[in-house]
A protein has these predicted regions:
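Cytoplasmic helix-loop-helix junction between adjacent transmembrane helices
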Residues: 108-148
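Symmetry-related core transmembrane helices of the 12-TM Major Facilitator Superfamily/SLC fold
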Residues: 171-188, 375-395
Length: 400
């Protein structure tokens, strides 16, 4: 009796196109960071305008995160992810076609946020289910985090290099991302769908659990730490590099991309550490993350005061670690507090609080006329100490 032939492993793992979609979404979301240096120096745009354009991503991102999961349930994971990739490509093509128009850049940032929200929400579900179908459920979260982190860090670094060394610094990086998104769109065409969707069914956002969102641990532990997630990251790679741009003459876009890549790479590495630090009866991981963020803010204040490139890099490492720890610990807290039926909506509330940190560069740019940046960053550290005290005070007395 002849042995039955073994089935050959697929040349491309089924989860890889979904991971590539997450990376492409992250790339598009963060390519603006080094381009902001070009807008400030070559286009002579006011720092407040550049901060507004950076923040324009947020009003598109949050609805995308909220609706992406329900849309994927209704229409299918692959269809929603592919539509998001197409929108992401168009969102990059728009500012490339009208790079000197703030309105076009703003519209592109807004559309990029929508595309990223849908791609991240639906793409994470798709990747998890593809990994589960291959018997690798335990690897899903790690693969999703690495794919998204690689896109965020790689997009900033690549855009910085393209803007630094090649012509058309405000257009070429956007066109490269648009081409990448279309390539990933083609790759996802043959990836397996994990759910057929429920055509005709209304979008269901999931119920709110009052017991969860009103729980003292959510109110006094999770929420006070949440703005530090992206507040830390954006201070590191949006606020600090321009403050020392005169110390790297001619290399501002590249330096901005390097700092962004460093910050986000450290954040990806730090997220698993939150699992090790996490404790069922304390908020140890959250507290360590907040202390790290406060330290990063103080080092950033010193960097701004002394125009020190080296201290900006040190601050980026600390703020990146704080970003990763506070993000990871917040997700762990949400997973413990929320019942499965309310997990998506509770996670969205946490995400909304975390993404409020994206407003930090705009708030600092607006208030920079009233106080110098070293004082503003020190003030942020003081606010962080207050939040740290609140979180530490209520963490032991309010176990989940």
């Amino acid at each position: 009796m002849e042995p039955s032939p073994t089935r050959a492993a697929p040349a491309v793992p089924p989860w890889l196109p979904a991971g590539a979609a997450l990376a492409a979404a992250g790339w598009g979301a963060n390519q603006f960071t080094p381009l902001a240096a070009v807008y400030r120096t070559q286009e002579q745009w006011h720092p407040v305008l550049v901060a507004v354009l950076f923040t324009a991503y947020l009003p598109g991102l949050l609805p995308g995160l909220l609706l992406g999961g329900p849309a994927a349930d209704r229409f299918g994971r692959r269809r929603v992810v592919r539509a998001a990739l197409l929108l992401s490509a168009a969102a990059s093509a728009l500012p490339a076609a009208a790079a000197s128009s703030p309105a076009a850049v703003c519209a592109g940032r807004l559309a990029t946020g929508v595309a990223a929200g849908y791609a991240l929400s639906a793409g994470n579900r798709w990747l998890r289910e593809l990994c589960a179908a291959a018997g690798r459920s335990g690897a899903a979260e790690r693969r999703a985090a690495y794919a998204t982190g690689a896109g965020l860090a790689g997009g900033a670094l690549a855009a910085g290099m393209l803007a630094e060394w090649l012509p058309a610094p405000t257009a070429l990086p956007c066109l490269v991302h648009a081409a990448l998104a279309l390539l990933v769109l083609a790759a996802t065409g043959r990836a397996p769908e994990t759910t057929g969707g429920t055509a005709g069914a209304p979008l269901r956002l999931g119920g709110w659990c009052r017991r969860t969102v009103g729980h003292p641990r959510f109110v006094w532990v999770v929420l006070p730490a949440s703005p530090a997630v992206f507040g830390a990251a954006t201070v590191a790679y949006v606020v600090l590099p321009p403050l020392v741009a005169d110390e790297v003459p001619g290399y501002a876009p590249l330096f901005s991309g390097v700092v962004a890549a460093l910050t986000l790479s450290v954040g990806v590495v730090a997220q698993p550490l939150a699992v090790r630090l996490h404790h069922a009866r304390t908020a140890r991981a959250t507290l360590v993350g907040m202390v790290t963020v406060i330290g990063g803010l103080l080092v950033g204040a010193l960097a701004a005061y002394g125009d020190s490139v080296a201290l900006v890099l040190v601050a980026a490492v600390l703020l990146g670690a704080g970003y990763g720890l506070t993000l990871g610990s917040g997700l762990l807290e949400i997973a413990r507090l929320a019942p499965p039926s309310a997990l998506p909506s509770t996670a969205f509330l946490h995400q909304g609080a975390a993404y409020s940190g994206f407003l930090t560069p705009l708030l600092l740019a607006v208030t920079a006329g009233a106080a110098p940046y070293p004082a503003l960053l020190t003030g942020m550290a003081v606010v962080g100490l207050l939040c740290l005290w609140v979180t530490a005070r209520f963490s032991r007395g309010n176990p989940p």
